[in-house]
Amino acid sequence: DRFDEVSEAWYEFWVRYSSSLQDYLVELREIEAEGVGEDIETSKGHVIRRKATARRKLNAKYGCPSEPWNAVDASLLWNIPNMPAAQISMLGKITGPTVAPMAACSGFGTTLKLAIDAIQCGEAKVAVIGNTDPEPHPLTVGSFFSARVVSQDGQVSKPFTGMRGTHVSGGACIWIVGDAAYLRGLGMKPLGLEILGVSINSDADHIITPTQKGPRACIQQALEVANVAPEEVATWDMHATATPGDWTELQNALSVFPGTTRLTARKGAFGHGMSVCGGWELTAQHMGFAKGVLHPVDLEEDEIHPQMREYGESLVRHELEEIEGRVAGKMNMGIGGVNACVISRLWED
């Protein structure tokens, strides 16, 4: 630290006496002073390229290295959150708003609610929704490791087991949702299930650890919006990250739904997408339930955590299971305490 202090003081003192620096700054100011010509459209590209060339020549003349800000690739702008939505709008020539709601693991449910609200309010007939996560970045994995919520033994992370932690994954999920009557009028047929209700709320309690009150309130809100009684829910897909939060979430589900509701979880199969996980999991639920089946968690009885083992019969553990009923539900709980709950049912013939 002391060396850095002395170095900065040395440079600050001598830079005032550098005639070359003053000459460099005068020439740089002249380069940057050039504005766009009278015809903006035809001039702007030429001016940008001319300035870039002049700066490179100026640096070479004075032996000056490239400035740090000139070493940054402009393609970094594609990391702005709404860029995937913008790209889809360009590919599909979609002129509606392109936004990127940020709700961590509850991101897909949040985007779904925004789309349904827009459709029900008459602001849209169709919406393209989705989430995308990059491949796991060392900073993301490292922060999860430091928070003690990532699996560290090299084995597949399974919900409801030893609470060893989750594992981070990347990918994307995109849906097209819309007014059913309108799309049927265009000759389209629906996939999956009909969305009856979506609710989102916040625990307002802890960044990582979920509460009981927040998710339970979210479930009740979704049931009310969907006009569905808990007894009607044939299956419930859980967030279940293979962390101690699984126990809290299981208690939440058992406090609302009857023992006949079949419980599933998907992160052992898909991994834990930071925003997209809800999309993957909801897609799996919809595509299976629409065919009358539930895909298993892939759990043997002796793998289930001892404290949860007495509730193991409620889990779809290791075999494909046929299911009766018409209503399915899904829960996601995101970092920051944000919850999203989706209630769906089979389409009417």
Identify the function of each model-found stretch.
Residues E123-A147, S151-R164, V198-Q212, M238-W247, ...:
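Acyl-CoA/ACP chain-elongation machinery
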Residues D1-L114, S143-V168, Q251-W280:
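Conserved catalytic cysteine-centered active-site region
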Residues I88, F108, A115, F144, ...:
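Conserved small-residue
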Residues L191, A226, P230-E232, Y311-D349:
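Flexible, low-complexity linker/loop segments at domain and module junctions
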Residues G154-V228, E232-T235, E348-D349:
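Condensing-enzyme catalytic core mediating Claisen C-C bond formation in acyl metabolism
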Residues V150, W175-D179, L254, V342-W347:
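Short beta-strand-to-turn element immediately C-terminal to the catalytic PLP-Schiff-base lysine
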Residues T111, C218-A229, V256, E281, ...:
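Stable alpha-helical structural segments in soluble proteins, enriched in small hydrophobic residues
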Residues K113, D117, P134-G185, R317-I323:
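Glycine-/small-residue-rich "gating" segment that lines the acyl/pantetheine channel
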